Amino acid sequence: EIISFKNSYHGSTHGSLSVSGNESKKFAFRPLLPDVKFIEFNDIEQLQEISEKTACVIMETIQGDAGVRIPSTEFMRALRIKCTETKTLLILDEIQCGMGRTGFMFAFQRFGIVPDILTLGKALGSGMPMGAFIAPFEIMNALSNNPPLGHITTFGGHPVACAAALAGLEILKEEEIIKNVENKGALLETLLQHVNIVELRRIGLLFAIELSSPTAVQKVVKYCHENGVLSFWFLSCPESFRIAPPLNISNSDIKKGAEIIVEALDRL
């Protein structure tokens, strides 16, 4: 069996839909993969569902489309221990939260654990299409036979996409962008205190701003777009909208953006 988490989102292909925990995105594509079980996110007691018959657990380190749901360090470490005890592969999906977004190169580093398999995408390609499946040699080697070359792709390793990804990695390292992410996120958070905000959830420079209703969110997003701030509501959490600025955003642009968001909130 495979274990995933309720309200998770892993993509739109057959396999990734099968392990995504939002039925509204899946119903039109059934039947999907069998023997996929969904448990509650960030609930240590639910980890008892993991057993020796569990092939893998797949999880977004930070649930993105569910509205920036951040697990506790206690939960993450208990998950790692349980997977190790049952010889279950732990797969962490950092397609949204990886590449410095949380203030670490990889979000799992915040919790002091290491997965067996890591998936990356989005920011990895620096604007070009690029995804990555990262694992130790023994796991990667298992994919190289039965059948031989059974996992290949026409455009895998595309030179231009790889060059863009490498350039982005070098800039993240050379310009020390990641070390400033937490301070920039904290600055923006202090500027977004408002009576119309029900809850603000943040990790690094990834925010979810929860309002009273999806209608209120749509009004704020529309005003922000019209005034130069790009945002969007979460498809699986429409009462919240996302703020995920560039990691190298300046403090002055943070202040300008916050002013526009506050103006939008004032108009509710």
Explain the meaning of each model-derived region.
Residues 1-268:
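Conserved N-terminal phosphate-binding loop of PLP-dependent enzymes in the Aspartate aminotransferase
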